Structure formats: structure tokens, C-alpha cells
UniProtKB/Swiss-Prot annotation:
Protein origin, superkingdom: Bacteria
Protein name, entry field: Elongation factor G 2
Residue span, tr-type G domain: 6-282
Key words of the record: Cytoplasm, Elongation factor, GTP-binding, Nucleotide-binding, Protein biosynthesis
Gene behind the chain: fusA2
Origin organism lineage: Bacteria, Pseudomonadati, Spirochaetota, Spirochaetia, Spirochaetales
């Protein structure tokens, strides 16, 4: 391969919106010699930053889709994955985090740790991504990197230590003092490309000494050698770096760097830090799930000769067709080789293999462990795993939660209708939690997803990317129906229409079952129903549970047992027994006391402690049950279970009740029985709708 894997870094730049993330990516590309002119995100020259290559991102100066770019810095190869900063795009962020080995957490030296920094940090913790922090915008009025360091400790609970201190702040920012080498660094020349090393200015010496001792003292936790040397005043730069690296990889130490990407100060030492302190692909344990062994976890190696395991983490519609970004975990992915998509259970051939540098690409022949490459023209979905010979692994669980909310879409005109189907086709491939279908009865297009916000993002993207104007209906909750007791049936289906008629009788009972949505048990003895018609009965029952009679939603948790029946030598047929089963089920269903089930969501709300009372109030007003509430450092986190139907418009209400300082996340937990008052209302609405349709 020629690439030394220990010199390879896969990093993401994670941040709150507007903390200067894209500008930092741009500078990294510049100093690593990837682009020859610098562009600002909202530049005067009308050329947006290189990493933001989706039109909408350029226009709004935010980053939505993660582009990946490979750069060389000294003897390191660095893949920079630009992650979205908006909370609404968290599926993108989480996907990017799967493929990162380390991250740079960017913070604004004025704004500090903001609500979204908390979300991003929580995701980094969940995926165990070691990080270094960069306090950006130190040239701005009100800049205070020391305050930001304290917030990293207090709000995020990170063991953060300064690796540098600033030489001047705001418009007097000249450079930084490196606390490892105890030298001052000034960034000079056009675009700050020349670094001048000098002695530390006299007035900063005491501060430098203080912060250096703090940092080394913390690093001695990870190195006995450093602890001994420090006591004797004999510590070396190598010892300090080795200890800080060890702490960072264990996620127990966060080195803090600072500068101003816009003013080209502090970027080169940050790039050095990526090499010094962030992990190479061999230092991170990646696990796959063995689908042949009931999703048993398997630890992947980084052997280039092992069978290939790779993850397609990002799809893009380019001018040359679908582009799939892939992270190789083990083995070598070669052009022309055959791979197996474990979700689609399909083999495919690797045609063109490229390496992306933001929007330009170079053709390559192979990619080894730790590499990030892109494939052309492969039909796959985001999150698919590609394996080499005889492996059936998935990088993430095949479990995709069922959507809990749906919305009808009506295109404004014929052109919008064409664009809408293109957009939906692409979005459903990109995001496994987003689905769409056409409702047979109303002939409307329905989209489904994990929450209100989730669907809003896609409607917005349709307008922008596909110039497609749609009208949206009211959000609909995915209810279910279920029986609550056993009921018997004995039903005869008889139809005489000249020629051969239809005849079939089925008898048995239905009862609730908790293990699965539907179970069929055949207890027929002595051929009361001929064996060739048993599957017809099963088919009929399956058809019957698709729509309940209370409010027309699917029926879950039902076991059907048949134990008797009757057939006719001429008039019995597949269709006759299907019809008999449907009739039998409907007859028993009314007697089995059916109930309506509603989706219950697990809601987590985080916000300042002073709003805890308001948060409890909001949950109680929504028929919610508080499961736990924890406090740490002026912050409160409340976990609750709340019916989805009560959560519409919640983000706006939460913002106004907490001065915009709280945020929430929500995921599907379970189905629960709807209270009688709610059920009665739903049944009334359904009956009124049916009456209106008949007219």
C-alpha cells in the first residue's frame, strides 16, 4: 500500500453553527496545499468555501452534508470529514461520527459552549471519539479562551487543559505561546504561512509557567515516567506529548488550542496536534455485527490482506451519477473486485474508485484499512456494509426504527410532481428512517419519519434542491389497534353466482399475543379443511389485520388458531377460504374488545436548572410520565415518556418556556393503550370521515 497506517488520521471538525468550522476546514486545506486561494464562507468574491459544495450551504453559509477531503500535513495523511453543524441534521452527524477516529471540537471564543456544542459533544461521547478542542475567533471583541476552557470543564465535564496561551487578544492577537516547547509562535507573511519562533514575552512568562504546570500535572496521571521527571524538573517535550496523547485517546484529557482561522493564526500547530494527539486507525476498536451469528459483535482488524469490510456512509447525487463515500475498516478495496452488500444481499463489481478532495476527485486503484474513498454508480443505500469473500457483517445494526409520524404532500403542479418523486427517491435512499408511499384510498403521497422536525428538513430540501413546491397536510400519528381478550369465531362464506360458487367455513378463536404482531396456529384434524387451503386461511387473516375496524389502523399482537371448518368439493377455492378467514376475523374482532394503541416517545430534555419546574409542567400537560431527572452543574436533564400526539409543535413551546436555552431529543419507545377519552374522539373522527367518503 505504501501508506503508513500509523501516520493516518480520520478526523471530523465538529462545532456549533457559526463557530467558524468551515473557515477552519478551508485553512487546513490551504496550509496542506490543497487550494491556492482562500475563500470566506460568506465571501465578497461570490465564491463560497471549498468544503461547502451544496448550493444551499453556500447561500446560507452553513454546512449540511459532510464532504470528505484528503490532505497531507508533514508526514501525515489526514482525511477531513466536514460534519453538519445544525441539530436538525443529526443523522448526517451520527453517520460521519461512525467513520471518524478523532475530532476537533471547534468553539467560539466569545460564545463559548453553546447548546449545540453540548449536542455535538454528547454524540462524540456516545461514539467514543477522542477529541482536541480549538477555541476559534480569538481576534473578536470579547474573546476569552480561558472562560471557554472553564465552560468545557463545567458544562461538558471534559478534563480540558490549555496547550497554548494567546499573545494578545481581540484585535491585538499576534500569536500563541506553546506550553510544551515554551516558545512564542508568531504567524507572519501573507496568509500567516511563515511561523516565527521567539522567546516568550516577559509579561506572559508567569502565566505560561502556571498553565504549563497545570497541564503537565494533569498529564502525569497517564505517565509514571513523566511524573518522576516532572518532580526533578527533567521532563522532555516527547514525554509530555506521549502522556497527553495517552490521556486524549482514553477520552480522559482534552488538549485546548487557540487561534483565529479567519486571521490565519494558530492553524499549523493545530495540524501538528492532530498528528501528536489524535488516534490512527489501529488505535480505535471498530466492531461489526455478524449477521450469520444473530448480530454477534466482531472486532475488526486493520490487516490489509484480510477480507474487505467497508461502510458506505454518505450518498451524493453528482453530475456523474450516484457517488458513495466509503470508509474501509479492514482489507483492501480494489478496483474491479467483487463485493457483497450485506443489507441488499447483492453482489456488485467495484467500477470506478476515486478519492474526493471536496468537489474535485482523483482516480485511484485501491483503498486500504482506514482509507476513505468513493465509489461510482453503485446502487445502495446510506449505511450499507460492503464485504469481501464469505463475510456477512454489518457495521451497524440492521434495525431501523419504524416511522411514527406521517404527513401528506400535494405538489402544486405537474412539474412539481415529477421533481417530488425524484426527491423522495433520493431522500429515502439517503436516510433509512425517512419513508414515502402513495395512499391507495386518497391517492395522496405520504411521507413518514421520526418527528416533526425530521420531515420539515426534507420538505425544505425539496424546495431548495429540486425547486419543488408542495403543500403539506396535518401531521398524522401512526396508531395501532389490538384485541384485549379471547373471542371465538365460526364463519361460513357462501356465494352463488351461476356456475361454480364460493364456499368455505372456518372456526377457531383469536387471542392477544405479546411476542409478535401476528401468529397463526393450525389445529385442524381429520381434513375438515383440505391442507391446500390452510395457506389461504393464513393469507386471509393477514389481510384482515391490515386495517382494524375502530379507526382503520393495522392490528397488532394477535394470535389466530383454527380448529375446525368445512369445504365443498366444487365451490371451495383459494379465494373462498381467504374470504371466509377475513369474515371470521371481523366477526371475532368485535367480541375481543379491541383497543387503540398510541406511539409513546422517549423524550429527553436538557436545560438550565432554573427552568426545571417549567420543563416538568410541559411534560405533565402532555400526559407525560417522568422517568428520571438528573442535575449536574446548573444543568438538568429530564427523561420522560410522552404520547407522540401531544408532541406536535413542542420545539416552539419549549423554546419560549426556557428562553431558548433548553433542547430536546425524542425517539420511539413503545405502543401504549390510549385513554378512553382519546379513543372515543379518534373513533368519532374516523366514523365521520367514512360517512363523508360514502357521500
Amino acid at each position: 500500500m505504501g501508506n503508513d497506517i500509523s501516520k493516518m488520521r480520520n478526523i471530523g471538525i465538529s462545532a456549533h453553527i457559526d463557530s467558524g468550522k468551515t473557515t477552519l476546514s478551508e485553512r487546513i486545506l490551504f496550509y496542506c496545499d490543497r487550494i491556492h486561494a482562500l475563500h470566506e464562507v460568506r465571501g465578497k468574491d461570490g465564491v463560497g468555501a471549498t468544503m461547502d459544495n451544496m448550493e444551499l450551504e453556500k447561500e446560507r453559509g452553513i454546512t449540511i452534508q459532510s464532504a470528505s477531503t484528503q490532505v497531507k500535513w508533514k508526514d501525515y495523511t489526514v482525511n477531513v470529514i466536514d460534519t453538519p453543524g445544525h441539530v436538525d441534521f443529526t443523522i448526517e452527524v451520527e453517520r460521519s461520527l461512525r467513520v471518524l477516529d478523532g475530532a476537533i471540537l471547534v468553539l467560539c471564543s466569545v460564545g463559548g459552549v453553546q447548546s449545540q456544542s453540548i449536542t455535538v459533544d454528547r454524540q462524540l461521547k456516545r461514539y467514543h471519539v477522542p477529541r482536541i478542542a480549538f477555541v476559534n475567533k480569538c481576534d473578536r471583541t470579547g474573546a476569552n479562551p480561558f472562560k471557554v476552557r472553564m465552560q468545557l470543564r463545567e458544562k461538558l465535564g471534559l478534563n480540558a487543559y490549555m496547550m497554548q496561551i494567546p499573545i494578545g487578544l481581540e484585535d491585538k492577537l499576534e500569536g500563541v505561546v506553546d506550553l510544551v516547547t515554551m516558545k512564542a509562535m508568531y504567524f507572519e507573511g501573507e496568509n500567516g504561512t511563515q511561523i516565527r519562533m521567539a522567546e516568550i514575552p516577559q509579561h506572559l512568562l508567569a502565566d505560561a509557567q502556571k498553565y504549563r504546570e497545570e497541564m503537565i500535572d494533569a498529564a502525569t496521571m497517564f505517565s509514571d515516567e513523566l511524573a518522576e521527571a516532572f518532580l526533578e524538573g527533567a521532563e522532555t517535550e516527547e514525554m509530555i506529548r506521549a502522556a497527553v496523547r495517552k490521556g486524549t485517546l482514553a477520552e480522559q484529557f482534552v488538549p485546548v488550542f487557540l487561534g483565529s482561522a479567519y486571521k490565519n493564526k494558530g492553524i499549523q500547530p493545530l495540524l501538528d496536534a492532530v498528528g501528536y494527539y489524535l488516534p490512527d486507525p489501529t488505535e480505535i476498536e471498530n466492531t461489526a455485527l455478524d449477521l450469520d451469528e444473530n448480530e454477534k459483535p466482531v472486532v475488526l482488524g486493520t490487516d490489509e490482506n484480510a477480507p474487505v469490510v467497508a461502510l458506505g456512509f454518505k450518498l451524493e447525487d453528482g453530475k456523474y451519477g450516484q457517488l458513495t463515500y466509503v470508509r474501509v475498516y479492514q482489507g483492501t478495496l480494489k478496483k474491479g473486485e467483487e463485493l457483497f452488500n450485506t443489507r441488499a444481499k447483492k453482489k456488485f463489481k467495484v467500477g470506478r474508485l476515486v478519492r474526493m478532495n471536496s468537489a474535485t476527485m482523483e482516480d485511484i486503484n485501491e483503498g486500504g484499512p482506514g482509507d476513505i474513498v468513493a465509489l461510482f454508480g453503485i446502487d445502495c443505500a446510506s449505511g450499507d456494509t460492503f464485504c469481501g469473500e464469505n463475510l456477512n457483517y454489518a457495521m451497524s445494526s440492521m434495525y431501523v426504527p419504524d416511522p411514527v409520524i406521517s404527513l401528506s404532500l400535494t405538489p402544486k403542479d405537474k412539474q412539481a410532481a415529477d421533481q417530488m418523486s425524484k426527491a423522495l427517491n433520493r431522500f429515502t435512499k439517503e436516510d433509512p428512517t425517512f419513508r414515502s408511499y402513495v395512499d391507495k384510498e386518497s391517492n395522496q403521497t405520504i411521507i413518514q419519519g421520526m418527528g416533526e422536525l425530521h420531515l420539515e428538513v426534507y420538505i425544505e430540501r425539496m424546495k431548495r434542491e429540486y425547486k419543488c413546491d408542495v403543500e403539506t397536510g396535518m401531521p398524522q400519528v401512526a396508531y395501532r389497534e389490538a384485541i384485549t381478550q379471547r373471542a371465538d369465531f365460526n364463519y361460513t362464506h357462501k356465494k352463488q353466482t351461476g356456475g361454480s360458487g364460493q364456499f368455505g367455513r372456518v372456526a377457531g378463536f383469536i387471542e392477544p399475543c405479546t411476542e409478535q404482531d401476528y401468529e397463526f396456529d393450525n389445529q385442524i384434524k381429520g381434513g375438515a379443511i383440505p391442507s391446500e387451503f390452510i395457506p389461504s386461511c393464513d393469507k386471509g387473516f393477514k389481510e384482515a389485520i391490515k386495517r382494524g375496524t375502530l379507526i382503520g389502523f393495522p392490528i397488532v399482537g394477535t394470535k389466530v388458531t383454527i380448529n375446525d371448518g368445512q369445504s365443498h368439493p366444487v365451490d371451495s377455492s383459494d379465494m373462498a377460504f381467504q374470504a371466509a378467514a377475513i369474515g371470521a376475523f371481523r366477526e371475532a374482532y368485535k367480541a375481543a374488545k379491541p383497543a387503540i394503541l398510541e406511539p409513546i416517545m422517549k423524550v429527553s430534555i436538557e436545560g438550565p436548572q432554573e427552568f426545571q419546574g417549567n420543563i416538568f409542567g410541559l411534560i405533565n400537560q402532555r400526559r407525560g410520565i417522568i422517568i428520571s431527572s438528573t442535575e449536574d452543574d446548573n444543568f438538568t436533564r429530564v427523561d420522560a415518556e410522552v404520547p407522540l400526539s401531544e408532541m406536535f409543535g413542542f420545539s416552539t413551546i419549549l423554546r419560549s418556556s426556557t428562553q431558548g436555552k433548553a433542547e430536546y431529543s425524542m425517539e420511539f419507545a413503545k405502543y401504549g393503550k390510549a385513554p378512553a377519552s382519546i379513543s372515543e374522539e379518534l373513533i368519532k373522527e374516523y366514523e365521520a370521515k367514512r360517512l363523508a367518503e360514502k357521500k
